Amino acid sequence: MIDFNRPALVGKELNYIQDAVAQGMLCGDGKYTKLCSEWMKKRFEVNQVFLTTSCTHALEMAAFLSDIQPGDEVIMPSYTFVSTADAFVLRGAKIVFVDIRPDTMNIDENLIEQAITDKTRAIVPVHYAGVACEMNRIMEIAQKYNLKVVEDAAQGVDAYYHGKALGTIGDFGCYSFHETKNFTMGEGGALVFQKNEYQEKAEVLREKGTDRSKFFRGQVDKYRWIDYGSSYLPSEMNAAYLYAQLEECDKINRKRHQVYDGYHERLADLEAQGKLDRPFVPDGCAHNAHMYYIKVKDLATRTRLIAYLRENGIAPAFHYVPLHSSPAGEKFGRFCGEDVYTTKESERLLRLPMFYDLSMDDVDYIAEKIHQFEF
């Protein structure tokens, strides 16, 4: 069976984990946490990086730092992972779902303004598949209405919008380093932002509401509980694994783009014949080859294709069930306007195997089997 995803060792992961153990500090915020943070600051040209235990927790931190209060409204697409909404629901917010663009599967920037009310406090664009939302327009809207922008860049690490790293354009950006992502620490994430005014509060929030970070810098003689907080700091072993992956960022990118381009070239004729749609990347967007998906005629065709590929030793995967159609989505949110594309396009989409060690022979085989399928 060709797996859908397989985490890879690409560099010095095991050596760095051994070194982390030898350092005698495994609890986090040590050598490798700092190395990861400094690497991202330099690579993505961002002032503040806080490594976290997940992108979910990075989103929760962003919701806290955005001062979301009970009854506030937060705008986002329904086609996203539950964590995007959960982080704000935990603060008592009402989620307002907006339809997506069928070409990128991202939030339709032209529908955001009509969803704004006097209760709206934030917009959460989700950069699906590492392809940027139209951030210039979204930032214009946010500035016009004095709204926070929290970028869900879980899939967008080392992807860019007009030269700017995704996650660094809005007020806050949230990354994922889950094992399914381009760069992994097993479970983990990061919160990034440009405004240094949020640094101290973010430190306290990540360290259980204490000034423990100041204590370790020698700025206070003991640390105390001073505000809201939780435990959002990953261990040094996780950070060590991630740092080895970040060091090989360009190597990982080259291989993933090779796989992505391989699919794209081999399936072009099927798109020309009207049998499927391939991913679309707008001008100004530099994607990171996080995933490769195709879109077929309808749900019935996708269901048949999934069964067919599995019979032939290939593990594809569909993706999100739109949040507004779920029980919690109905309870905690509402859909603004008409669901023209969210449900329809989500039912057409199928993700193909994509990981660092996927061979081009496997790409050839997968493309061949898709060609043999009776659309």
What are these regions (language model features)?
Residues 64-153, 160:
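PLP-dependent aminotransferase-like
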Residues 58, 80, 353:
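Conserved SAM-binding loop
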Residues 34-39, 43-49, 110, 114, ...:
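PLP-dependent aminotransferase class I/II
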